[in-house]
Amino acid sequence: IEASVLNCCTAFNWFCRNFYEGMDYEQINQILEDRYEKEDGVLCLPYFQGRGTPKWNGNARAAFCNINLSMEKHDFLKSLLEGIFLEIKSNIELLEAYAAVNHVYISGGLTKSNIMNQMQADVYGRKLCLSDESESTAYGALAVALKSLGVYASEEEGLEILLKRTGNTYYFPDEEKA
């Protein structure tokens, strides 16, 4: 099952291109690590090209709120990511109406950053699993299909077997932040 947060990586890239010109992602990650513990209060509604699931709205637009003159661009970057992750969390909570979600498998461009993965674990309040397998999304779809065909008792069993040859990195939520 997949949910949609429209243009989340595109919004991150846009922000970095416009506010961190000339900096590479390693430098940006370091800024996030340095600022992660800071409570700044900036809020971001990340609807740069509308809102995806669970409350589709093609006319929704992005906004940064709760801003004062002490804010810096780093506060906006952190709030952008938190806004994206909160949108994903709302999708996870929607899925929980149908099945327990004890941990979340993550993949994609933003998962190359340890600090962003930790931010996600903290926002979702769940353990995250990042597979070393670059095609983990395809394996997830295969596990669902094989479970429905009766090959495996559950998607989890299928993923465990299919991804056995790869390594995984786990991120655990900080209970104080979750």
Segments predicted by a language model, with ranges:
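Glycine/Thr-rich phosphate-binding loops that ligate phosphate moieties of nucleotide
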Residues: 1-178
